Amino acid sequence: MFPKNIDKNSSIKALLGPTNTGKTYYAMDRMLSHKSGIIGFPLRLLARENYEKAVIQVGKENVALVTGEEKIIPPFAKYFCCTVESMPLERSFSFVSIDEIQLAADPERGFIFTDRILNARGTEETVFLGAETIRPLLQKILPNCEVEIRPRLSTLSYIGVKKITRLKPRSAVVAFSVPEVYRIAELVRTKKGGAAIVMGALSPRTRNSQVELYQSGQVDYLIATDAIGMGLNMDIDHVAFASDIKFDGNAPRHLSAAEIAQIAGRAGRHSRNGSFGVVEDYLNFEEDTIEQIETHSFMSLRNIWWRNTELNFNSLNNLVRSLEAPPPFNFMRKKVGALDAICLNHLSEQDSIKNKIDSKETLSLLWNICQIPDFSNSLSSMHFNLLEKTFELLLIGKLDNDWISSQISRHDRVDGEIDTLLNRISNIRTWTFITNRKNWLDEADYWQAQAKAIEDKLSDELHDRLTQRFVDKKIVILNKTMKEHHNLEAVIRLDGKVFVEEEEVGTLNGFDFIPYLSEGEKAATILTAARKILPKEIERRVRELLISDNAAFKFNSDGAIRWQNNKVAILVQGDNLYSPKISVNNSELLFRAAVKLKKIGRKDIIIIMVGDGQIKDQLIFKSKKPWIKRHT
């Protein structure tokens, strides 16, 4: 990929612009027109998505997928879809492309993107994709790079404040903490029937399942962190911000206009316009920020991150010094504190490891082990212990099967809360990464399958848990039916349970309908379908009541009159103690039937009190006179 002999006619081009401008489509099309090619994506999710598209176009045998956790490399693969970190550096390709190069300014991963800008070249064509904010710095690095600016295909407009409960369907709400995402999702479930969840902590499989829940129309709302700002092309009309402050690893800070635009740009696709706004008055964006977002005019990047990739493995000190080498441009910031460097520093201080670093090969092995990611982002002693044990085992051969089994199997559980499942997924993803290092294991394919199976199992369980917690399942099923058939079929069973499209939505208790669904627009539509069949049943029940035998009625000590064990009326104060009145339950479904029911009430009701003043008699009424049965 970094060939020494690049054709002098090889072109370098940058395609820059906001989201929804067809940049990735262009790069994929260009790659597949070459005899070989590779694209580096910022997310595993994106690499997988475009891998699947390429497979459809040119066949599975011609396309490879390479990420930290997944490697599918057919023997004669021509086209590679990779995460930027996992691009095979030793290979040469006719076409090379790097997506989202403005991430060179990201404090955590930026140095990787900067390295690819500096060094990744196709022998015939190189295409960089990203935001226009990186243009000035890119042209300083590559003066001969041809730059094309792509305009957004639709408009993005600010519509101000709109409360969460008033958001229209096909809206996304963005927050920047897991508890806040959960709080909003629960509110939307109550008021709107449910929402899908997208967070960076989700595994790709869980995220895809949640996105499908939204895309298929089963729910109309999406609650997300800024994880939706990249790589998720969805049918979103409006993006609402519940906050504009995020924790960037060091401290809370306000989002920049460009960052807001990256997220808001998910609204509207292709030529369909989108909108963005906030959910509270105090969040209103500044006029200048709004103008920048609507016109896609942002301040250019001033700095990007860099770290030396020409490392010296002659000794530990030489390796550390080479990592600390100064950048080639004054607008590049030297990256310090990367996870691999922190792990190297920690492990090399351990005597059990330091004393074993006796060659370039050993030091190189240690450095490769330090690349093992900590997906939990906790950098705990558990992660250091994992790296240390891995190093010790690889020094004497391959990773021990029994040890691998014990490490992987501990995560093969689906009990616990949502956060527990998220933690297990983070841990098993680390093992998915390790098992993809084939030269570290004797039975790599087997262990890859084991780790992937557990990750998939946990991911599916997490999706189910999120759906159970944040989605009214009845709404989901009925919403899908509504989209397919428009008309909903409702029935009442003999036990009073009311079903719409075979989903129980409530029960008819006497003359009262008790719904089980949450409030909201979809619930209202579904309950309307249910209520259409209720008036006839109410009239039937009134007719049955009027001809019922005495045994069908009961009079309780609380004054309630029950018919067939359902409360239908209550005694209320009348003209005197011996002349109470009957008040029929206030049911929205009785209508004219209620008038008929009231006529059976008479003024000459007699209540017999005995002993301690408790009512010992049942009042059973029928026809024109009350009927009293003494219980003695």
Predicted segment positions?
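Conserved segment of the helicase C-terminal RecA-like domain
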Residues: 122-136, 216-217, 221, 234-297
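Interdomain hinge/linker at the junction between the two RecA-like core domains of SF2 helicases
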Residues: 4, 8, 68-78, 132-170
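Conserved strand-helix element at the start of the C-terminal RecA-like helicase core
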Residues: 35-50, 126-129, 135, 166-191, ...
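Extended, charged helical/alpha-beta scaffold domains that provide interaction surfaces
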Residues: 357-599, 603
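C-terminal helicase lobe
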Residues: 157-174, 258-261, 266-349
